[in-house]
Amino acid sequence: MSDNTLLLHTIMILDLEPNYNECRYCVRMLFNAVKFNNIRLVMHLLRNGVDPNFYDEYMRSPIHYAVEKGNTEMVKALLEHKADPNIFDDNFDYPITNSIIENKVEIVKILLQYGADKTMINEFDLLHDAIKNKHIDMAKILIDNGISLTMKDTDDYTPLHYAMLDNDTSVIYNLLDYIFKVKGYDVLGNIVHDILCNYDLYKETTLELLISYYIIISYLYRGIDLSDIYNSNIEILLNSKHLSDIKEKCENEIDVMKNAVICDGIAIIDLCTGYDANSIARNSVNLKRFSDTKLKIYRYYIEPIVEIGKYRRELLYNAINSMNEYCKSESNDIANWSCLPFEIKYKILENIKDDETLRKI
């Protein structure tokens, strides 16, 4: 149906002045307007009282079709007019589960905001599928909203198993880091435990990454409470020659990072946590050189920190150049900026903590 046909139907409705909530033509019109992404007609019908929870012969309501279309504006409009986010069709498909499976991140956020049932996400293997398909942003939303990280699928595997099996180190690191920061060390420990119990399924590189991340956390966050699951995991590592060799290599590199001091008198291990972007920026060149020459296992951990430093340093350099250009005119050089040494200019701008402010200079 074209927009012109929909418009004609709208005019007919307006002329007939029907009871919108009881008019079957109006309800059918709402379905068609949603299917054809006609937000103006949808809003007109909703404002005049058409029930957004009416369903068709497939038990599907307008919100099912809006989700299917991926139209965030339409989904939000329906929810604002009391569409039920937890309504299901004759296949027991829910708007929230469909949008998760189809990786419609913004729609999932909207559905959750308007009361979609969070318990539904544990009724299916949604996190398993998100990780299999490398939908990391979706996986993070599921983690934020309480999905079980140790739930096993029909093959008896937890979600992280599929990232490990795929040997995608970037995905594994992202997930481990996010789980630790959002859920804590104990939850991470339980996930690691399940992987270690099945370590023969995985490649050396992924096991190195998993074990190295788990071990370094206890060094970086010294106040962390090491629970029974930590001791159990260490015992598994020590009882396997293969795993204990990986553990030893990790600890040797950690010792190197503890003993290596760069130009600000800061140990590499300390620069990994607790220092601001300016400290990292000042030391990013030395940090990169150290990572390239001294590390093998923990290079993946240092590289993102180096990038933070490089970004901050480039931002400061660009801000200095912008200020230099602005102060070329004598009338603009109020604070005698042009007379200052580069090092002083750099130090002054370091005090601007907000990167957004620096970008505007």
From Swiss-Prot:
Keywords: ANK repeat, Repeat. It comes from Fowlpox virus (strain NVSL). It comes from the Viruses. This is Putative ankyrin repeat protein FPV227. ANK repeats lie at residues 25-54, 58-87, 91-120, 122-151, 155-184.
